[in-house]
């Protein structure tokens, strides 16, 4: 099951809601996933989804809150996956005109009928109604990527004005959704992980948001471990390179002028470095009597490297 299906399955359990919330939710579903048809038998409206939980919710909301006994149809998709496609159909005799009027989709002005797919003003004025509307928009046209791979949540709509309205509604919850055009569709999307979690909280997908939070924590831990490993590897590489350079300098001094020409403190550490090329500066310092700190050992080895460099340039 995809993560989108999990989220939809979770939020489709919200059926014990007020009539106002149900109207907002059904309005969003209709505007995102619905098709209006005119025929000899009158008007009909069809909502299409590949998610069985979404189809059941639409059917239940219509029956429980609007006394509309819609028709539920199922057919096989033409795609390679051959998924079922669920269609909830409301005909003239089932009360489609009243529902279209209640949702603000069908309006009559001076005897002329017109379609309006904007989000009505009253939706913006109540927190619970806003949440129900966004929940409906996700049920009708939303999707979310697998959070193990990437963070991306989107709503597919077919009107630029509607997409902008939906984005504005989402952003009343201090989110930063944006709108882009993709072929003939207008996409409202969020890409930042924390914001996706916040939106899932808005629509009531609490189990799903906890799953994303756990994934985000694990990703962050893995990234931190990788950073530490990379840092340790880089430091180890620098240490090894420095030790190789020091041994080469000491061998040059030994062959050119002899170790006996070095001051006692430098000869002492030079001999230790030759005998223990893999030891750290701290470990070399602890071998001396009295012991010398890491910075003191580093200072002596730098002096040795300087002497070797002078020998190289004097050739």
From Swiss-Prot:
Pfam families: HTH_WhiA, LAGLIDADG_WhiA, WhiA_N. Coiled coil: none annotated. It comes from the Bacteria. GO terms for biological process: cell division; regulation of sporulation. The keyword Lyase does not apply. GO terms for molecular function: DNA binding; endonuclease activity. Keywords: Cell cycle, Cell division, DNA-binding. Residues 280-313 bind DNA. Involved in cell division and chromosome segregation. PANTHER family: CELL DIVISION PROTEIN WHIA-RELATED. Belongs to the WhiA family. This is Probable cell division protein WhiA. It comes from Clostridium beijerinckii (strain ATCC 51743 / NCIMB 8052). The gene is whiA.
């Amino acid at each position: 099951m995809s993560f989108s299906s999990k989220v939809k399955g979770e939020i489709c359990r919200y059926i014990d809601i007020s009539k106002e919330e149900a109207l907002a939710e059904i309005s969003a579903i209709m505007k995102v996933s619905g098709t209006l048809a005119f025929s000899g038998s009158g008007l009909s409206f069809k909502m299409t989804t590949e998610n069985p939980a979404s189809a059941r919710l639409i059917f239940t909301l219509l029956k429980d809150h609007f006394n509309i006994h819609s028709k539920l149809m199922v057919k096989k998709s033409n795609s390679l996956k051959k998924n079922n496609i669920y269609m909830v159909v409301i005909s003239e005799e089932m009360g489609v005109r009243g529902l279209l009027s209640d949702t603000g989709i069908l309006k009559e002005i001076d005897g002329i009928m017109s379609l309006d797919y904007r989000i009505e003003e009253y939706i913006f004025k109540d927190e619970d109604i806003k949440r129900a509307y966004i929940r409906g928009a996700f049920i009708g046209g939303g999707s979310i990527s697998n959070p193990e791979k990437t963070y991306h949540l989107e709503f597919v709509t077919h009107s630029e004005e509607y997409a902008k309205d939906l984005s504005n509604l989402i952003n009343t919850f201090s989110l930063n959704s944006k709108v882009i055009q993709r072929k003939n569709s207008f996409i409202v999307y969020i890409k930042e992980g924390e914001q996706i979690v916040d939106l899932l909280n808005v629509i009531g997908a609490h189990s799903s948001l906890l799953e994303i939070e756990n994934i985000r924590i694990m990703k962050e831990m893995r990234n931190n471990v990788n950073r530490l490993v990379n840092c340790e590897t880089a430091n180890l590489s620098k240490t090894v390179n420095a030790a190789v350079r020091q041994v080469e300098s000491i061998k040059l001094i030994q062959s050119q002028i002899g170790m006996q020409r070095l001051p006692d403190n430098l000869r002492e550490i030079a001999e230790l470095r030759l005998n223990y090329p893999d030891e750290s500066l701290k470990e070399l310092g602890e071998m001396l009597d009295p012991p010398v700190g890491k910075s003191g050992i580093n200072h002596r080895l730098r002096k040795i490297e300087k002497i070797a460099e002078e020998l190289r340039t004097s050739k």
